[in-house]
Each structure stands twice: as C-alpha cells, then as structure tokens.
C-alpha cells in the first residue's frame, strides 16, 4: 500500500556520491511509500530510489537485489526486449540500459495506475516531518511541459520523467492525453530543452495522424465471443490503414478454456490488445491468425497482477528514473553554459565598441 513505511538504511545513504540528486534523508528515517514516490518522480532523489527498492525487496521476501530482479522480470513481462537493469536510480552502468521502445511500453503500463498519474502530474509536494527530522521537505516538478507559465508548457501533457547523465545526455519520457488518444513519447540522448521541442513534435504527429477505432462497433475476430471491457477495447490505426489490413491473433490464457486475449497487429507492430471471452466452438488452444474484418481491440491490460500493485507501481516508477541520478550535474552544466555565453557576449560587445 502507498501508506507502507519505507525505512532508510545506511546503505541507501552511503552509496550517494558528490553531485547525486537527493533530498537529504538520514539513515533510520522513515517515509510513506507515497511520499517516497513523490521524491523519486519529482525530485529524482537517488537515496529514496534505493530505499524504495530495498523496502519493497524486503516485502517480497528478499532485499535490494530482489527488487532489481523484479525490475527485469516486470520489464520482460511488458514486452521489453532491449533493457537490462542493475540499479534503482539510473546512474551510469554499462550493464544498465534500455531503448526508446521499451521505455514507451513501460510508460504506457505505469500510466494505467491512478497513483502514478496523480503523482506525475503534481507540480509540488510537501513531505511532512519524519521520525528524525522535524521539518517539511518540499519537492517540485522538473517536467517543464506541466508548468503553465513555462514556454515548454503542453496542454495535453499528463506527466512523465526527466533525466540526465553525461553518458545518456538529456532524456525525457512524457505521457499525453487529448481526450481521444493517450500517447507516450520518449526521447533519448537529446540536448537540453531540445527534448521538449522534439517531444511536442512527436505528440503533434501522433495526434494528427493516428485514429482510435472501438472494437464494439466492429465484427469480432474468429474465436472471440465477447470483450471483457468493450468500452475500453480499441485499436489505433496508422495513417491510411484500414482495419481490414490488420491481423488478429487469439490466444487462450494459460490454464483457461474460456478466457483469452486478442491482439491486432499491422506489419508486425501491435496496434491493439484486449481481454476476451472465448468462443468454445472455435479452436484457440494454439494461436490462430485471422484476417481482421471490421474490428479492432485494444487496451493495455488494466488488471495486470492486481495482487501486487505496490510492486508494479514501485518497479515502474523507479525504472522511469533511468537516467536521473545526476540532476545536479545538469544544473551545473547549464549554469556554466550560461556564464560562458554571458562572457562571450561581453567579449563581442567589447570588440564592437573598439571598432572605429
């Protein structure tokens, strides 16, 4: 539960290095999991990421490394194919890596969690005094697309995660919802504010060129009797693509003869997926490929592993912190760059004044 306590061990504090983003937690302090996730997602607090991983790992019957294993297992289950996690903060490690595709899958999954949406959209949050520190800690949103007064503000933005390391450069994962489509944009190895410009361009293209088609308005694929949640079952069609161009794959869930999934693809890319009740008159024990007729189905599985929601929220939230460990470094670099530009401007101004 989000009210569970996260205790900070000495390990969670002592691993910090100079320049690592943190909120000044002490060994022996306790926060709720909810406040911890605010610190992770808004302030990129590295010691909190470690403590969350360690605490949830203990709840799973293990330790910090148990949580790291869970991160890898969860990303594999989501369909990630180019990721491997070795820590819970995103600081550079040759064996800690991901892809834009995988981050989009993770972003789409975590966006289904109400707790994540609430935290990720918050502009500021106050962490109350703890058992050891009698002061309020305030954490502020780093994602500029959420601040109305910022030049990078984007009205459809629903949250995300900023990141930076010297090796990965600027990275940004962003969720957006225009009332019809929900999209995730991922930019990696970008440069400063260009990440926001590039993210906006991705969203503009997505919202202007893709359309959502509801499954309930179309003919069901062979082997499908009904949809578990037809109000949220749909496919997203690329430009100039008809539903009849899609392929449908119907599979029975492990150990079930009545429940399954239908997955629609276009040229190998998944464009929709939905939980279904199977038509037992049709054989679907093995995957059956059928040509789409007039229908589409999609929704991220919103009921995934409800028996361990805290683990999923914590895993994906920390995964979204992939490259946020050195926030202090980017501030330093930006400040240094501004000083350099001011000096260069003064030199140019001085040279102009010296001209006859």
Regions found by a protein language model. Give the residues of each.
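Cytoplasmic C-terminal tails of single-pass
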Residues: 335-356
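Domain-terminus/edge residues, biased toward the C-terminal soluble/receptor-binding domains
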Residues: 80-81, 95-97, 101-102, 107-316, ...
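Active-site-adjacent loops and short helices of periplasmic peptidoglycan-processing enzymes
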Residues: 1-101, 105, 110-114
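Intrinsically disordered, low-complexity charged/polar segments
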Residues: 323-324
């Amino acid at each position: 539960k989000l009210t569970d306590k996260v205790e900070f061990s000495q390990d969670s504090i002592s691993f910090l290095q100079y320049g690592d983003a943190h909120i000044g937690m002490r060994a022996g302090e306790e926060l709720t999991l909810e406040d911890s996730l605010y610190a992770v997602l808004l302030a990129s607090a590295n010691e909190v990421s470690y403590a969350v991983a360690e605490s949830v790992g203990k709840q799973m019957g293990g330790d910090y490394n148990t949580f790291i294993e869970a991160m890898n297992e969860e990303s594999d289950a989501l369909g990630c194919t180019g990721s491997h996690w070795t820590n819970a903060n995103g600081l550079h490690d040759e064996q800690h890596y991901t892809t834009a595709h995988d981050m989009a899958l993770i972003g789409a999954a975590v966006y289904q969690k109400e707790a994540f949406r609430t935290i990720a959209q918050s502009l500021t949050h106050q962490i109350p005094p703890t058992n050891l520190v009698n002061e309020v800690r305030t954490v502020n949103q780093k994602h500029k697309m959420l601040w109305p007064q910022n030049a990078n503000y984007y009205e459809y933005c629903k949250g995300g995660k900023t990141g930076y390391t010297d090796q990965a450069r600027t990275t940004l994962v962003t969720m957006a919802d225009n009332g019809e489509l929900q999209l995730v944009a991922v930019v990696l190895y970008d440069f400063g504010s260009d990440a926001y410009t590039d993210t906006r361009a991705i969203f503009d293209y997505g919202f202007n060129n893709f359309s959502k088609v509801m499954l309930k308005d179309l003919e069901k694929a062979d082997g499908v009797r009904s949809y578990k949640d037809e109000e949220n079952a749909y496919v997203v069609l690329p430009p100039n693509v008809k539903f009849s161009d899609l392929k449908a794959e119907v599979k029975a869930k492990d150990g079930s003869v009545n429940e399954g999934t239908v997955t629609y693809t276009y040229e190998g890319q998944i464009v929709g997926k939905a939980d279904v009740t199977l038509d037992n008159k049709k054989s679907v024990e093995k995957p059956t490929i059928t040509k789409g007729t007039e229908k589409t189905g999609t929704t991220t599985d919103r009921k995934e592993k409800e028996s361990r929601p805290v683990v999923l929220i914590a895993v994906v939230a920390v995964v979204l912190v992939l490259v946020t460990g050195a926030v202090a470094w980017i501030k330093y670099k930006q400040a240094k760059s501004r000083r350099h530009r001011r000096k260069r401007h003064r030199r140019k101004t001085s040279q102009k004044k010296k001209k006859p």
